[in-house]
């Protein structure tokens, strides 16, 4: 129905109105499956209303769950626990951002005043490690998105958030945040 209905309607309307297709390519998943592996259907009564999921867990959690769950061309086995876990991952990211911005605000940190070159001599091993991991993630994520392997890109991002950023880096630098304002190693962590 999506292929015949929405995609074709958009294609026909775009060509008639503007003389060109409104999209270059279309990427779509297979069926949305219920907990028993059956395709969701209103007539079967096994549909999960997206609005209810968004209201309870947020749109970003639902999007992130759908992104990382299955290859775009495969069926998606919908599990509410998966959406909950996606929300937890995003909350971890939010907490990391909150941790960093709280200390940066206390110290009136301005990234325009502390350049990478100024911070580089004061990087600790964990700072250099996170910079390396971030660069690796950026390259891997870009390659996977370009290859339309969105599920792999989403999973790599999740692993980076939970393992590299939260479980390792934040724990390793936590004590440095108690250093005096202007401490070079603390500023290097901020810059990281």
Which role fits each region the language model picked out?
Residues 1-7, 156, 191:
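Short, conserved micro-motifs enriched in small and acidic residues
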């Amino acid at each position: 129905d999506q292929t015949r209905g929405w995609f074709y309607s958009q294609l026909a309307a775009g060509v008639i109105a503007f003389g060109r297709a409104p999209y270059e390519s279309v990427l779509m998943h297979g069926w949305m499956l219920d907990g028993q592996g059956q395709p969701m259907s209103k007539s079967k009564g096994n549909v999960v209303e997206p609005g209810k999921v968004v209201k309870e867990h947020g749109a970003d959690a639902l999007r992130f769950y759908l992104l990382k769950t299955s290859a775009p061309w495969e069926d998606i086995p919908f599990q509410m626990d998966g959406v909950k876990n996606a929300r937890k991952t995003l909350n971890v990211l939010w907490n990391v951002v909150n941790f960093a911005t709280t200390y940066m605000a206390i110290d009136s940190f301005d990234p325009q005043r502390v350049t990478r070159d100024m911070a580089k001599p004061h990087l600790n091993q964990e700072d250099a490690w996170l910079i390396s991991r971030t660069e690796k993630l950026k390259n891997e994520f870009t390659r996977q998105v370009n290859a339309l392997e969105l599920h792999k890109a989403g999973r790599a991002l999740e692993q980076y958030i939970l393992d590299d950023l939260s479980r390792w880096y934040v724990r390793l630098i936590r004590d440095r945040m108690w250093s005096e304002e202007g401490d070079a190693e603390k500023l290097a962590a901020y810059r990281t």
